[in-house]
Design a protein with these regions (language model features):
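Extracytoplasmic thiol/disulfide redox context detector
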Residues: 1-91, 170
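Cysteine-centric redox/oxidoreductase cores and disulfide-bonded domains
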Residues: 86-174
Length: 174
């Protein structure tokens, strides 16, 4: 597929530089003919998210409805990559890392509730330089997001089963 070209009116200007010469050289041509974009396959959308990042919260607030619609319409696939870039910004509690681990717990044990849990983490996000939520509060949020196997998810979150994975995922991302 050829992208349309934009003519530079000064590129091949004649020595006299007359307006007529420049206009003739800058006239667009009919080629190439644009072709419609194929819509056969869904668009693959990848979102890297730190649950303490205000930018991640703003992205979620601005785009969650549209992303959900595209996924529901099979127009897009959506993959979230929880990362913990702001681990040191929570008074030593490592909230960013623990929240990313909690998201991995929900993705592993209740994948059908991940989008709701992800949304809850971002829309009720604690402020930077605060303690953030405790592991028990994160588990309560997972339950509130509709996780059915509450005991397994709670144990996963409170035992911080996926924090090492979240740290490694963050290292890979950066």
């Amino acid at each position: 597929t050829n992208a349309p070209q934009v003519a530079n009116p000064l590129a091949d200007q004649t020595v006299d530089g007359s307006a007529a010469t420049m206009a003739a050289e800058a006239a667009p041509t009919a080629e190439p003919t644009p072709e419609p974009t194929s819509t056969a396959a869904p668009v693959d959308i990848r979102v890297y998210v730190d649950y303490l990042s205000t930018e991640a919260r703003e992205f979620q607030s601005a785009n969650a409805t549209q992303l959900s619609k595209w996924v529901g319409d099979d127009a897009a696939t959506l993959t979230y990559y929880p990362v913990a870039m702001l681990t040191s910004k929570s008074n030593g509690t490592k909230y960013s890392l623990r929240a990313a681990g909690a998201a991995a717990c929900v993705a592993t044990h209740a994948s059908d509730r991940f989008f709701a849990f992800n949304h809850e983490l971002l829309t009720t996000q604690p402020a930077v330089d605060t303690d953030g939520y405790s592991d028990q509060q994160l588990a309560d949020m997972a339950q509130g997001a509709g996780v059915s196997d509450v005991a397994t998810v709670r144990s996963c979150i409170e035992d911080e089963t996926y924090t090492a994975w979240a740290k490694a995922a963050t290292d890979r991302a950066i």
